[in-house]
Amino acid sequence: IGVVAQDSPASGDAAKAAGVPWSGYDSDQSTNYPEVWLTAATYEWSTYELPRIQAILDGTWVAGNYYGDMADGHIRLAPLGPIVTDETRALIEAKKAEIVANSGVMFSGPLKDNTGKEILPAGKQATYEELMGMNYLVEGVKGELPKG
């Protein structure tokens, strides 16, 4: 195993016991597992909830889907762990800036699944509906999705 990734602190225990890096999800565990911690995607729900609550109070709320991103502050990265090198930190910061600048572009082609089938042709951007209907593993990911 090269890296453990999951949203349970139990994964941190397993990563620590095995001495492998850990990338969490939805929770900052950087102080609990500093010797194996990489980072985690986290969510700041107030960026969504506060404007919606105000709209409800104002009588202007309209139902709809919300897909937050780094640009609106909804998606964040937890602190990078001490095992993350300076070179990697610089790459992460550059990629974060690129993601924010291209807010709304989550997947664009060319994109293939792990069987080599083209999912998105070069230059095409995935729609919200396509993202919500993802039922494949991308190129380079080993394994299969469960059937049924």
Task: State what each model feature region is.
Residues I1-G148:
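A residue-level marker of the well-folded mature domains of exported/periplasmic proteins
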